[in-house]
Amino acid sequence: MRMNYFVVGTNDMETSVKFYGALFEHSGLTQVRPSERMTYWLRDDFAFAAALPFDGEKATNGNGTMVGFSVGSAEEVTRLYKTALELGGTCEGEPSQRGPRFSAYVRDPDRNKLCFAD
């Protein structure tokens, strides 16, 4: 079994598309098939999406829920961390060595928690 895709909820699709579009710009993920309710970014082996909730209720971030991205290097961790903050994300943990991995933590504008690790 392997991870196929991950979807984060949003209450503002325009802000999410701007945030993730810029964040993923150099990552190999390509934006495809945007609709009024959901926008996907794809790579050969993975998909990520931002979506307005199907039930029409307000999107909320999960307490204890986090999306982790393996990005290949400490430099890329730091670049993505800084980019996320420039795009309106907030810091949840500055780039540093944590155990065997160099990582950083941010929240997107909807407060979904993301981790970037080398």
Model-identified regions with their sequence ranges:
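Absolute protein N-terminus
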Residues: M1-M3, D118
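Vicinal oxygen chelate
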Residues: M3-N11, S27, A59-D118
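Residue-level marker for the onset of beta-strands and adjacent loop->beta junctions
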Residues: N4, S35-R37, C91, F102
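Core segments of cupin and vicinal oxygen chelate
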Residues: V7-F48
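Short secondary-structure boundary/capping segments
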Residues: Y40, G56-A59
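Conserved, structured core segments of small domains
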Residues: F48-F54
